[in-house]
């Protein structure tokens, strides 16, 4: 019986060129987050299922349809993380980080898992960058997290390919009034709604606004607007966020139906979308989640239960589809000892060059012509030959593979020559 060699459906191998693009996106995001005062953090990709049961919302698509859930050998229910925020908040509570100096600002990246229909920009194993600011309830914190997202997209040369949509879900009082209005409105169309939306009508009508069903969308287009149900405090908060964005020159569109797909959001929610990646239009999204800490059982030393927080995540695969970045190949130096007698001389030079941060490989097998062919195949910039003459004269014969020119360089001038003449 033959072994199945293809990756599991919805996963893929990241070969060097695509890996380089992913690595570039993560590096840009990490470096910019550091300028904003964020620190790196990493959590396990596997968590107890309860972490997500308590945070994502029982009627969310993620929890009801997309989670990878299984029993471990101790008969404990565990899940592959479908997103980062709940795991980060668990780490904060477990490690008592909430009682350190606030705010906490964390950058993380890595794989997440959702059992979904694979298509362009959407895999069952996918990769994200994730940023969380925990412990700051100011409107500027909301604006700053959007500004960081904008700076990442700008550095990736994607600002002209995306649009920022923003909304506010208001405070709990605002949401309660709005949800009642939605129940009254959608109840008139109960039989016309999709089965998923019918099941959400009573417990979480906000989620109907997030439905991907085309008929649901048509009904939602005339639904009441949450903007008519804000408390004065919620309205002032959102107005201040928008004021900061305008001051920073960030263009946005208010989308009254934007609610995001998870239940822990409140106040500001936002998405950067693009029309250039097919059905998966959202490339980056996030919002405020002030109630998540309390929902997960967290407590502050002061006795308070609420820990404000805001963050966002971006899909690396989707960013990679949009960016035109091409990883720059580092062209190595190839050392070719002309015979076995000089292998050790070649290995000594190999170590010397690597210790000086020069990418170098050594080729010890086959004829000189075959080794030159391999050097050309890996796009080496130069070949260094070592033989009896070179050892005797304490020199190296160097061939430039772009021009085919050769030169002889004495030992103590080799480093400066390579540093000045290699791309």
Curated annotation (Swiss-Prot):
Offer an example of a GO molecular function term for this protein.
ATP binding
Q: What is its main location?
A: cytoplasm
Catalysed reactions, semicolon-separated: tRNA(His) + L-histidine + ATP = L-histidyl-tRNA(His) + AMP + diphosphate + H(+)
Query: What are the recorded Gene Ontology BP terms?
Result: histidyl-tRNA aminoacylation
Q: EC number(s) per UniProt?
A: 6.1.1.21
List the subcellular locations: Cytoplasm
Tell me if Ligase is a UniProt keyword of this record: yes
The alphabetical list of record keywords is:
Aminoacyl-tRNA synthetase, ATP-binding, Cytoplasm, Ligase, Nucleotide-binding, Protein biosynthesis
Tell me where on the tree of life, at the top rank, the source sits. Answer: Bacteria
Class of this enzyme: ligase
Membrane-crossing residue ranges in chain numbering: none
Q: Which GO terms describe its cellular component?
A: cytoplasm
Entry's NCBIfam families?
Answer: hisS
Family label = Belongs to the class-II aminoacyl-tRNA synthetase family.
The record's note on quaternary structure and interaction partners says: Homodimer.
**Protein name (database record):** Histidine--tRNA ligase
Q: Which gene encodes it?
A: hisS
